[in-house]
Amino acid sequence: MDVKKLIVVAIEKKVLDLTGKQIEIRLDEPPSINMGDYSTNIAFRLSKELKKAPKIIAEEITSSLSIPGIEKIESLNGYINFFMDYSVFSKETTLEINSKQENFGKSDLKNKKVILEHTSANPNGPFHIGHGRNMVIGDSLKRILNAAGYTVETQYYVNDMGRQEAIVVFGNDRFKLDKSKKSDHAIGQTYVEANKLLNENEELEQEILNLMKNYEEAMENGIENEITEKFKNAVEYALTGFKETLSTLNIHHDKFVWESEFVRSGLVRNVINRLMETGKVTEEDVYRLDLSEFGIEKKLVLARLNGTSLYSTRDVAYHMTKMENCDFAVNLLGADHKLTGIMVNKTLALLGYNEAEIVFYEFISLPEGSMSTRQGRFISMDELFEEAKLRAREEVKKREVAKTEEEIEEIAKKIAVGAVRYNIVRISPEKPMVFRWDEALDFEKVGCPVIQYAHARCSRILENCEPSGLVNSKNLFEYEMAENEKIIVKLISKLPEIVEKSAEVRKPQILANYALELAQGFNKFYGNCRILKEENETVRNSRIMIVNSTKLVLENSLDLLGIEMPGKM
């Protein structure tokens, strides 16, 4: 039962009768359910137009107003407060959740395809924690958009044509790959060694330029040769390691799109030619595109004078292909790429294409001394995860919840994935964040373990009863419910609304914060309401239904954030 929607529809009709206009109704939630479950200030908004006091308007709206699922409607000093009939609402909510199971929270198909690009790190070394923020937010958005009814295709844009990849190929020709290392780490080591060699011998720079030029020419002419093979092997070797890291964090891309595809297909050349014809390109040290009509002072670097393309041009070609194959596109980009992302979008507009939506995220860092790094320069996502798992193992052993080494490992891995993913996704992307272990692995207040532990608590309760036999009970919730019962039922009912809102505004942190609020609400319910030891059978069965429903909603919420439940903690 969508009580909120029923309230809005009923008030809209009353307002239409009073004003002859369709006016958007906004509902607020009072700080305590004792003051009402929902309220509206619509009477204040209409006061000037109707030339009446808000109190009088509120009374006119509420007179003879009846809404299914609402037990009491109160007009108080111009505000209209709605009190739900919790006996009806609780029964319908818990039965719906138990009926829909893993589908509770999901919406009908919207018949819109989304291409969501995330991660897209250069294949020249392992993912660092900055990439981690991109991949976690991106994958969470994919899951949420899917649940909201969109058809989502996730893409990883592989930069196989830039200077950085040419340096990797150059390095592979001179240094032996350390096959004892994970492949992306081995590539990273070669990249560092090659850069050092280039810094010490400036005359070798021409070799990098030649590699880039020869690779692009081969791609443009559809030629497979020794150079193309070297680039392909280097990139694929790095991607093998990338995919391992992504899989560890429950992240999988639908498609890996190579940058060179657009050179090979001729689309990049087509983009350059079309932009040259706009009359907005100037020949300087390179060809530059004037975007001043969009309020951008800096010019987009289009191509080198020798005709070879640049990353920005290939990016435009990639986005043209995206836009031709979806209803809208979403990109995850670091804040340091803000100008570049906007410039690519305006170039698309110049060519008659829709712009991509961009979710920008700020930097992520670790407190100094929180963990050591064997890389010396940055913390890789692999190191971050291993450290999380090590700390989680210690906690699992301390709590004595697992008997075998395999069980300890399985629980620790799920806690570690949850700690890393949740601690990243709960913070708004536009805010810089510091990854703190005391928050990530917090079992008491803000960490994912709080949510996982609430779920484990639900599981333990349900092990001692049979909730499946309760769904047909006719007298569920037919008693005076406690405040903590009402609060938790209201919370579990909100998942569909939360998913819809998170998808609409592209903010997975809304769902993350909801999951924590739900876990905290359940803990209060558990601490204040007897469940299995409750003597009244109706009350006991109703509370078991709340436990089972909460367990399902917690599972569904964390699943949309790419996090699994350990089962016991």
UniProtKB/Swiss-Prot annotation:
Residues spanned by motif 'HIGH' region: 121-131
GO CC terms: cytoplasm
GO molecular function ontology, one term from the record: arginine-tRNA ligase activity
InterPro entries: aa-tRNA-synth_I_CS, Arg-tRNA-ligase, Arg-tRNA-synth_N, Arg-tRNA-synth_N_sf, ArgRS_core, DALR_anticod-bd, Rossmann-like_a/b/a_fold, tRNAsynth_Ia_anticodon-bd
Top-rank taxon, per record: Archaea
Catalysed conversion reaction: tRNA(Arg) + L-arginine + ATP = L-arginyl-tRNA(Arg) + AMP + diphosphate
CDD domains registered for this protein in UniProt: ArgRS_core (cd00671)
A Pfam family it matches: tRNA-synt_1d
SMART domains recorded: Arg_tRNA_synt_N, DALR_1
Compartments, record wording: Cytoplasm
Family indicated by similarity: Belongs to the class-I aminoacyl-tRNA synthetase family.
Name of this chain's protein: Arginine--tRNA ligase
Source species of the chain: Methanococcus vannielii (strain ATCC 35089 / DSM 1224 / JCM 13029 / OCM 148 / SB)
Gene label: argS
